[in-house]
From Swiss-Prot:
Role summary: Component of the cytochrome b6-f complex, which mediates electron transfer between photosystem II (PSII) and photosystem I (PSI), cyclic electron flow around PSI, and state transitions. PetG is required for either the stability or assembly of the cytochrome b6-f complex.
Bilayer topology: Single-pass membrane protein
Protein name from the UniProt record: Cytochrome b6-f complex subunit 5
InterPro entries in the cross-refs: Cyt_6/f_cplx_su5 (IPR003683), Cyt_6/f_cplx_su5_sf (IPR036099)
Subcellular location(s) of the protein: Plastid, Chloroplast thylakoid membrane
HAMAP family tied to this protein: Cytb6_f_PetG
Record bears the keyword Transit peptide: no
Keywords recorded for this protein, A-Z: Chloroplast, Electron transport, Membrane, Photosynthesis, Plastid, Thylakoid, Transmembrane, Transmembrane helix, Transport
Family to which this protein belongs: Belongs to the PetG family.
């Protein structure tokens, strides 16, 4: 049961981590565009 619980936690954290990285990269990209302008 512990393995299943850890597996569920990992599956839940992966999309959140990817979303966080995507948002961070997007904000830095927009910030770079604004600095260029």
């Amino acid at each position: 049961m512990i393995e299943v619980l850890l597996f569920g936690i990992v599956l839940g954290l992966i999309p959140i981590t990817l979303a966080g990285l995507f948002v961070t990269a997007y904000l830095q990209y927009r910030r770079g565009d604004q600095l260029d302008l």
